[in-house]
């Protein structure tokens, strides 16, 4: 899979420092991005209509300081679609499931690498094409924190069943 690095974070004294940040070059650009940790484990995959906008939002949550004075009571445990998905808790201090995911990633990873997939299907203007690419990458590489959204859930279950269970 052809890819280019757009973001790299390295933990120093418990906080992420930005090593590489090229996301501004992708304002208004649609695509599919992938996120790895220091163990080369795929953490997340997402398609987006604006790479910069989405990764800037995600980056803000990865760089946030999560202090003990926040409300750390557990609200619920995020649902998993597949066994390979990582369990994580959504706490009272979390804005939503997404922010809880990035809080968990920030606590557990020592470094993060984000790549933009630069293949025709991944850069398609057609959202359904990008969603299919996202789903295939996430399932085939067992992305720990990936979560199918809406109608993508059924497509993901069918894809997994046809590719891995019917053999």
Which positions does each model-derived feature cover?
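Boundary/linker segments flanking structured domains
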Residues: 1-43, 48-167
């Amino acid at each position: 899979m052809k890819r280019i690095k757009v973001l790299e974070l390295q933990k120093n004294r418990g906080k992420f420092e930005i090593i590489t940040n090229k996301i501004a070059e992708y304002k208004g650009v649609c695509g599919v991005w992938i996120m790895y940790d220091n163990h080369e484990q795929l953490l997340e995959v997402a398609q987006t209509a604006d790479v910069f906008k989405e990764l800037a939002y995600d980056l803000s949550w990865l760089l946030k300081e999560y202090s003990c004075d926040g409300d750390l009571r557990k609200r619920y445990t995020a649902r998993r679609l597949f066994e390979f998905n990582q369990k994580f808790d959504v706490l009272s201090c979390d804005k939503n499931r997404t922010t809880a995911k990035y809080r968990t990633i920030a606590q557990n990873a020592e470094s993060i690498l984000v790549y933009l997939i630069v293949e025709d299907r991944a850069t398609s203007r057609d959202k359904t094409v990008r969603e299919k690419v996202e789903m295939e990458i996430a399932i085939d590489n067992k992305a720990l924190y990936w979560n199918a959204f809406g109608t993508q859930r059924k497509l993901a279950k069918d894809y997994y069943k046809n590719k891995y269970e019917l053999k």
